[in-house]
Amino acid sequence: MLTIIADSNIAHLHDYFNEQTLNHPIQVISMAGRDITADALQQYQPDVLLIRSVTQIDAKLLDTNQSVKFIGSATIGTDHVNEGYVSLRGMRFVNAAGCSKHSVAQYVMSAILQLRPEYWASNTSQSDKPVKLGIIGLGNIGSTLARYALDLGWEVLGYDPFQSASVINNASVEKVLAQSDVISLHVPLTLTGHSELPTYHMIDADALAKMPSTTMLINTSRGAVVSEADLLADLNQNPERQVVLDVFENEPTVSAELLDKLTLATPHIAGYTLEGKLRGTQMIFDAFVRSYGEKGADILSIKETDLMADLLPDNPYQWQQLKANPQKLAEFYDIKADDRQLRDSVNEQAGAVLGTDFDALRKNYTLRREWLFD
């Protein structure tokens, strides 16, 4: 029998990982991601861990464990996983790279266009001053966001030192900061000593000082990419600046003082669409089958299968339809409703949204639909 410990927030977990789909005896133990601890591993001795970004995969979790052979993260980001350590231990790690790239890009576009609806027409064909969208980080999400911006006729100022120069990777970070109308962050969280260009506190007092006070800042990557202390100081000096945060430096706790200064704030749900979450589960399921199925350890007598197509209902949301009817934006995604839910969760006595309440908002989130782009 294969034993799996899985984050209970993984979409359609039991539709994918069961004895019928795998044709093999299997035990799936689901729990909150923050409860996947060394003690839990000691108790259940799992062969497989299926996680999301709240579970830290490192020596603290795994040093005393000898049972885990496969770790799948149903997320784009990997900064919660010490990949060097995992490799050293001979474990296989996979993530769901790109699974929610359209979901996050659509979240960013929703934020921009709900706050600045005039940008629908601020393009190269209708304006002599088209919107300049600055994108820092041009991986799966950043490059997808650029496609939406270019489709609206906006100008993209992109910066990614790890990508080759291109139509969208076309600016220095200084130019992005100084000349963008909106800046959207799409970088992993890396620390000094672990990267040539660490992103921890990339947006600090110096970076904020280079941005015009009218520049909107959006962060959907990792909270600590932005220094919240410096951001709060900047917002006190420049109250007109619009800032949208989906991630927070001290997540899952969110300061009420900071929240009060933000234009929009949501509980780390930018990628939370039905399509994005299902795609993440499908991707780690496929990788699991490759590891344990006919191409791998021959434990499972099955091949990869596309369950996602069977689980998705019809999708009425199309990007081109929204472009033709901008007034329907809130019907496609009402970002302000998610903002209200987070603000309503502030514990006045603590002066913050508590971690338990933040996690509950994520766990109970009604998944929105991803718009069809092409």
From Swiss-Prot:
Subcellular location: Cytoplasm
Enzyme class: oxidoreductase
Entry binding sites for substrate: 53, 75, 272
Protein's UniProt keywords contain Cytoplasm: yes
Pfam families documented for this protein: 2-Hacid_dh, 2-Hacid_dh_C, DUF3410
Top-level taxon of the source organism: Bacteria
One BP annotation, GO: pyridoxine biosynthetic process
Keyword annotations from UniProtKB, A to Z: Cytoplasm, NAD, Oxidoreductase, Pyridoxine biosynthesis
PROSITE patterns in alphabetical order: D_2_HYDROXYACID_DH_1
Pathway annotation: Cofactor biosynthesis; pyridoxine 5'-phosphate biosynthesis; pyridoxine 5'-phosphate from D-erythrose 4-phosphate: step 2/5
Entry keyword Magnesium: no
GO MF terms held by the record: 4-phosphoerythronate dehydrogenase activity; NAD binding; protein dimerization activity
A GO cellular-component term linked to this record: cytoplasm
Enzyme Commission identifier(s): 1.1.1.290
Active site as annotated: 222, 251, 268
Binding site residues for NAD(+): 160, 246, 271
Reactions accelerated catalytically: 4-phospho-D-erythronate + NAD(+) = (R)-3-hydroxy-2-oxo-4-phosphooxybutanoate + NADH + H(+)
Record's function text: Catalyzes the oxidation of erythronate-4-phosphate to 3-hydroxy-2-oxo-4-phosphonooxybutanoate.
Family: Belongs to the D-isomer specific 2-hydroxyacid dehydrogenase family. PdxB subfamily.
Subunit description: Homodimer.
Protein's recorded name: Erythronate-4-phosphate dehydrogenase
Annotated organism of origin: Psychrobacter sp. (strain PRwf-1)
Lineage: Bacteria, Pseudomonadati, Pseudomonadota, Gammaproteobacteria, Moraxellales
